[in-house]
Amino acid sequence: MLPLTEENKHVAQLLFSSGTCPRCILRFCGVDLPAPYKHPSKELLNELQKFLEPEKPELILEAPNPPLKKIRLHEDGIDNLSEDGKEGVSVTEDESMAEKPSKLRVCNVCLGILQEFCEKGFITKVCQKVEASGFEFTSVVLSVSFPPQLSVREHAAWLLVKQEMGKQSLSLGRNDVVQLKEAYKWITHPLFSEELGVPTDGKSLFEVSVVFAHPETAEDCHFLGEVCRDCFKPAKNKQSVFTRMAVLKALSKIKEEDFLGQFPCPPNSPKTVCTVLEVECTHGAVFVAGRYNKYSRNLPQTPWIIDGERKMESSVEELISDHLLAVFRAESFNFSSSGREDVDVRTLGNGRPFAVELLNPHRVHFTSQEMKELQQTINKSSDKIQVRDLQLVTREAIGHMKEGEEEKTKTYSALIWTNRAIQKKDIGFLDDLKDLKIDQKTPLRVLHRRPLAVRTRAIHSMKTHYLDEHHFRLHLKTQAGTYIKEFVHGDFGRTKPNLGSLMNVTADILELDVESVDVDWPPALDD
């Protein structure tokens, strides 16, 4: 039984006679229970036809009296009893039987979406494509894109029903109509879940996107472009100005009389159903974090390409991410880290925290043992880098790497050269300097990628180790973001004070190592 009342009968008949499908009729009658929509289309059609059939006049005749018209004998004995218990027969006029079309008409509102494209057969075909895509997933979210002209047709049907109900002193608000996407979700989500064996979840990282089109009615929206020009502005990456949001905006602005003067109400019946343009599977990004050591003084952190020409054969990013890309079967990646070192700087100690965002990965489930094996594979592939603490993390956890980045500290070891001969006593005062404030203009070497500014940084402590008349080793603990090379040589006076000005010499840096990046992330793992 359909959850429709006598009050709905006139509207249902009006829509049905204009070519609207049973499920859309339920929507316009405000049926907001999922269960009725889930019945098969043909079953709903039969139920609707029964609901709309005129009541059959039934005459209870005395048995001895002959019937005056063609009679229908009911096999059910209870139906053949009159009110006083006497046996009787019911009489039905042939003319009162509603005609039942042998073939389903394409709905003039949903263009077949709620007819052919939410039945089990269609869902099975979509799920076959999903399973063939090779993605790992434990839940799924279904995303559907309907042709924008459906909104125009729905608006026309709503105006039709609203006018009809107004004649009965009843009202129908736009929000009283169950949304097409909502009804589609009620029907298809349980079928998808059953077919794929996983729950449907609006927050799932795995998305199945189904895009519908209906070329036959593609011009339904075009009159809105003339009436509401300001709603349809060309946008980049959009094949048509008639997007769903633009159409909805125009429909909210257009006057009823203007709409009715431009578009048929009820909408005309199409000859064809919608077509499926594509079924696409995508998986949200997954994130891998760890720490890396860099042992080469001839390796950039990221690919070094100038004017399309590669300057170095590899990079830290590639040596790590290429392995992750292959194992996770991802389409691409984004690499980030807690700071960066120059091509000629080593990163020692516990390494530098890094994270890799893997986009549209096909494989996403890894045990801790599998992550250890992946780490070993990366480490065996090159003697220029090593990684540790390799682990899967959440998007939110990536924020810990960047939190308070400039308040963090880093320690360095630098080999210093001076232009004039020095003695051990000439560098001893540096050990006593604490929290030295320096002002650094953006270094000349990075002006091409960072804005010009003066940044105040802190040298928290220094420790010296004398080597010979022109060399000593300097250990520094600094505020993150300090340019160490510029602190040593002064960058033509752009860093003040600098090591040269403090010692009254010309100083330069020959070697630099990062000894620690004091960020307590990602969590250390047992080897």
UniProtKB/Swiss-Prot annotation:
GO terms for biological process: primary miRNA processing; tRNA pseudouridine synthesis. Signal peptide: none annotated. It comes from the Eukaryota. Keywords: Coiled coil, Cytoplasm, Isomerase, Metal-binding, Mitochondrion, Nucleus, Phosphoprotein, tRNA processing, Zinc. This is tRNA pseudouridine synthase Pus10. Residues 440-455 are annotated as: RNA binding thumb loop. SUPFAM superfamilies: Pseudouridine synthase. Residues 42-87 form a coiled coil. PANTHER family: TRNA PSEUDOURIDINE SYNTHASE PUS10. Proteolytically cleaved during TRAIL-induced cell death. Cleaved, in vitro, either by caspase-3 (CASP3) or caspase-8 (CASP8). Gene3D superfamilies: 1.10.10.2050, 3.30.70.2510, 3.30.70.3190. Protein with different functions depending on its subcellular location: involved in miRNA processing in the nucleus and acts as a tRNA pseudouridylate synthase in the cytoplasm. In the cytoplasm, acts as a pseudouridylate synthase by catalyzing synthesis of pseudouridine(54) and pseudouridine(55) from uracil-54 and uracil-55, respectively, in the psi GC loop of a subset of tRNAs. tRNA pseudouridylate synthase activity is enhanced by the presence of 1-methyladenosine at position 53-61 of tRNAs. Does not show tRNA pseudouridylate synthase activity in the nucleus. Its EC number is 5.4.99.25. GO terms for molecular function: metal ion binding; primary miRNA binding; pseudouridine synthase activity; tRNA pseudouridine synthase activity; tRNA pseudouridine(55) synthase activity. It is found in: Nucleus; Cytoplasm; Mitochondrion. One of its GO terms (cellular component) is nucleus. The active site is at D342. It is an enzyme of class 5 (isomerase). Belongs to the pseudouridine synthase Pus10 family. Zn(2+) binds at C21, C24, C107, C110. It comes from Mus musculus. Interacts with components of the microprocessor complex DROSHA and DGCR8. The keyword tRNA processing applies. Its main location: nucleus. It catalyses: uridine(55) in tRNA = pseudouridine(55) in tRNA; uridine(54) in tRNA = pseudouridine(54) in tRNA.
